[in-house]
């Protein structure tokens, strides 16, 4: 073994000893994540884009994409529940379903039935529920609306045409 190999092995051994020493006796401690996204960050970067994409998918009758975006929207709300336990003393996991679950079910039914009219109505109801949640939580200045255009110029929302 050359000097460099011995130094590397010695350094690795040193790190293992330090890590083992610092972890010993702390097995039951849960180490918090280094980064936890804030509520506004999740809403702006996850919920809102999928809310928009869900609408665009439905407008173009791209039902597979609409179902995918609905699932992504559900995941985004689950992230809110996971990372933000409470908001102004209210438990988010208990509060959100009252504003979302019914509308998610109605939208999913419209998507599976490929019913554009039902989809538009359900999407409008979901959007209204978003605003009702904001109002109930002293955030009435955040008003969500049905998108008038797509901010996603790099994504096609029309279904793929097959021959």
Protein language model regions, located:
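Bacterial N-terminal signal peptides
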Residues: 9-18
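The canonical Cys-X-X-Cys-His
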Residues: 126-137
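Short, solvent-exposed, charged loop/turn and helix-capping segments
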Residues: 76-95
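Short helix-adjacent coil turns
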Residues: 60-62, 111-118
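Immediate post-signal-peptide N-terminus of mature secreted/exported proteins
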Residues: 23-67, 157-163
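Solenoid-repeat scaffolds in large eukaryotic assemblies
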Residues: 65-66, 73, 119
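Bacterial N-terminal signal peptides that target proteins for export
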Residues: 1-10
């Amino acid at each position: 073994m050359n000097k460099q190999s011995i130094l590397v092995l010695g350094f690795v051994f040193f790190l293992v000893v330090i890590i083992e020493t610092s972890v010993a006796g702390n097995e039951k401690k849960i180490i918090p994540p280094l980064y936890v996204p804030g509520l506004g960050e999740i809403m702006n970067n996850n919920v809102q884009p999928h809310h928009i994409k869900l609408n665009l998918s439905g407008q173009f009758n791209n039902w597979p994409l609409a179902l995918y975006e609905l699932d992504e929207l559900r995941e985004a709300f689950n992230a809110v529940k996971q990372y933000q336990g409470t908001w102004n003393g209210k438990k988010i996991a208990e509060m959100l379903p009252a504003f979302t679950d019914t509308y998610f079910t109605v939208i999913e039914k419209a998507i599976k039935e490929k019913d554009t009219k039902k989809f538009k109505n359900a999407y409008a109801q979901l959007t209204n529920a978003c605003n009702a949640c904001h109002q109930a939580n002293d955030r009435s200045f955040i008003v969500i609306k049905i998108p008038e255009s797509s901010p996603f110029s790099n994504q096609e929302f029309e279904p793929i045409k097959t021959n």
